[in-house]
């Protein structure tokens, strides 16, 4: 929610007493909301959702960390956080090698970006 004013920033705030770092890049913003890319350096539970809420820009549709009352009528239809992991990197559990998983952005996510006027410029 809201306009993310910085082009990029780092949020370094502890979560449950543990170090947590999120690097935020603003892809596109308007008066009401922003399309962000977030790369986390640490992997705390709900880290992106919690860090953005702490920065007073909760993920749209996040009923746990976001506002309890949604004023924008369009957004009331969302029943899930508008959040998608395009790429995940982790250590393979058995052999320790780097494992990278990619997932394309779902069509409904693109529809929301269009509805909110947040599609990246081509």
Report the location of each language-model feature.
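RNA pseudouridine synthases
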Residues: 1-122
């Amino acid at each position: 929610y809201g306009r993310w004013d910085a082009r990029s920033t780092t949020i370094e705030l502890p979560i449950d007493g543990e170090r947590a770092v999120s690097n935020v890049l603003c892809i596109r913003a308007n008066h009401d909301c922003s399309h962000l890319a977030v790369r986390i350096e640490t992997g705390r539970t709900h880290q992106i959702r919690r860090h953005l809420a702490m920065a007073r820009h909760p993920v749209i549709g996040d009923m746990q960390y976001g506002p309890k009352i949604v004023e924008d009528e369009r957004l009331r239809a969302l029943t899930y956080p508008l959040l998608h992991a395009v790429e995940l990197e982790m250590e393979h559990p058995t052999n320790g090698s780097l494992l990278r998983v990619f997932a394309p952005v779902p069509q409904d996510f693109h529809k929301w970006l269009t509805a909110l006027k947040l599609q990246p410029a081509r």
